[in-house]
Amino acid sequence: MDNKLDGLELLRFLAALAVVTYHIPSIGIGHFGVDIFFVISGFVMMLSTSNNTSQFLLKRVIRIAPLYWLTTLGVFGIALLAPSVLKSTDASIIDLTKSLFFIPFDKNGAGHQPVLAVGWTLNYEMYFYALFALSCLLCSRFRGVLAVSFIVVNIFIQGNFDNFVSQTYANLIVLEFGLGVALYLMLKKDIFQMLAVLSLIGIGALFNFEEGHRFFLFGLPSLFLVLIAISYSNRLPNLSLIPLLGGSSYALYLCHTFIIRVFDRLVDWFSNENSLLEVSAVLISLLGSIGVSILLFKYLENPILIYLRQKLINKTH
């Protein structure tokens, strides 16, 4: 399987862009981008550990945590210094600590409410990273089957408790990582393991079928979108822009709400029910979010990643 999957990079960017459109008030469509992310994540975890599983968890923490921590601290700073700017975020040290350590919590009955609102998905990411890392340690050959087994067993266990953390990990959305694992095994023609993973996913889905509408409506279609993206990778033009967009998708996902809020304020000040200006503001919000995310990736996120990898991975590997 070709490790240069430009189709996957492009889909990653489009998934982030879909989440951006979901948070633009006048559009409000695109939350399925998160489901695409989760399927991609399961696939990439299998692909990235196909030859070497060592230091997997460290590598993923280095990739995910720095920018998330910076943006979370930024939001906390705003909540502390200018609380009127934010609607539902308090300058709570307890909330900050839970957010930085990827611990799910319920804020005033509003569901997932980390300091950086979009960070709820990263709680799921880190959860699966931990299970996958454990699976790599136990048996790297069957790491995918083991990881999905842990997820399904935990769905059964956590589903018996009413607390928010348990209900978070019993949510069928976690099975979307398993879809990515199954896709990798299918493309590797490992039919036995693929069928094992799909059987486990089916068992997990049946346990909480009535609450699993998101998994069925968006998770399964996301699987086919990821398959299409991988299949067409070699047919895409060899453009440096595609890896750049894919690389900046994480910054786009984390930071877009700030940019949208700025342009929303501008529209409120100047629009006077001017529909043309409102349409322009939507386009500017999209383009502005993309532009800022590319700058953040090139001049902040990527330099930090390179530095941490050199200091923490290359020296110990």
How should these model regions be labeled?
Residues 1-8, 14-29, 46-55, 105-111, ...:
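Alpha-helical transmembrane segments in multi-pass integral membrane proteins
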Residues 8-15, 34, 40, 68-71, ...:
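Hydrophobic alpha-helical transmembrane segments of polytopic
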Residues 93-99, 108, 149-164, 173-177, ...:
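A short, conserved beta-to-alpha structural element at the edge of catalytic cores
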Residues 40, 58, 64-126, 130, ...:
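Membrane-interface helix-loop-helix regions
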